[in-house]
């Protein structure tokens, strides 16, 4: 019983839950090449590498981008085996207005629409951003960038919106 309550507390402390499954591998370069005429895929790999590098460098995130990196910096990012792994769902945990723990499940096929707090400030800033989740993925990333502290492989979870 005590172990069960410890596991429950650990689950509540986690912001989200995403499968570790590697049952649906996607070769990222083949995936983009096969869909090159779809505007959604325009600049996908450079943007994804920018995102990974920004996270690895612990840069501030404004909710839209970490900023642009030059090609030389992007080339320091390696996606292990050129594989990303598709997941069917992700569960997002949160605290409700009445201080209860709750969560929502996002599924790109059935419940793809999300709303997040906007980082924008100012008189005409919108309080929320809205997006549609196209895919849920995880992968392993390695970077040899000089400023990345740990030169080991890092698991990266990401939503494609």
Which residues are covered by each model-predicted region?
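Terminal interaction-prone segments of large eukaryotic proteins
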Residues: 1-161
